[in-house]
């Protein structure tokens, strides 16, 4: 699986076991991702942070 780094078009190949790409947003600025990368389990959203996860190449 290949996931984008914080600034596309840069990307990295995910290590074994991290089979999701994710984007993390602050709820106050939903248009600007704060973090991107590979993750094993999609974290739960909170009052301040929203996560978007997906399992195809460079989908984040």
UniProtKB/Swiss-Prot annotation:
Gene3D superfamilies, per the entry: CD59
Cystine connections: 3-21, 14-38, 42-53, 54-59
Tissue expression remark: Expressed by the venom gland.
Record flagged with keyword rRNA processing: no
GO MF, any single term: toxin activity
Domain of life: Eukaryota
Complexes and interactors: Monomer in solution; Homodimer and oligomer in the presence of negatively charged lipids forming a pore with a size ranging between 20 and 30 Angstroms.
Role description: Shows cytolytic activity on many different cells by forming pore in lipid membranes. In vivo, increases heart rate or kills the animal by cardiac arrest. In addition, it binds to heparin with high affinity, interacts with Kv channel-interacting protein 1 (KCNIP1) in a calcium-independent manner, and binds to integrin alpha-V/beta-3 (ITGAV/ITGB3) with moderate affinity.
Protein name: Cytotoxin 8
Organism: Naja annulifera
